[in-house]
């Protein structure tokens, strides 16, 4: 496959730890619902269908996910507004199968048991388009090595983005890591519609989906 004309010419498979950009969007009205720590015994859910949602933004990807029996969603997000929105949703509906973690996923991933997740969703992550900010992109060999240990054998990782440079660079990283060429998917699978996707569609941007196993 020929590189897309907007794809960066040079892509690095970073092996160092990604740099976490600590920029929480905190508002006073959310101050009572954020930064709470809920300690749960994750091992008792090992036999469930566990979904890891990384960077759920304002929460649409979690709130709009179709509920099925024996399914548990674990959402990781750094921004307080999205965390507060999902916590309000959980508390209002008295939902018990959604767990929220605020902070850096590169650190939080260490807290999960090995062989735990069936699915990983990474929908419309921050592309960090400026070259000097590429070190903040978390899909690197460093993170993939960690993530792989947390996945069950028949796992599925789903990445979606409308940012051409980001998705082609990510595809390059994955091709190197997996030592094979993965292709873009022609279908969205069970990906819920989010605010970011609606925004991309309004701009008539192409949405790319990468679906693979680690």
Question: Locations of the language-model features?
Answer:
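A short acidic, Gly/Pro-enriched loop at the edge of an enzyme's catalytic core
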Residues: 111-119
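S-adenosyl-L-methionine
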Residues: 1-50, 60-67
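A structural alpha-helix within SAM-dependent methyltransferase catalytic domains
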Residues: 63-66, 144, 148, 171
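Conserved beta-strand signature within the Rossmann-like core of class I S-adenosyl-L-methionine
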Residues: 154-161
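Class I S-adenosyl-L-methionine
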Residues: 170-172, 177-214
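A short glycine-rich, Lys/Arg-flanked "PGG" loop and its adjoining helix->strand segment in the class I
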Residues: 139-153
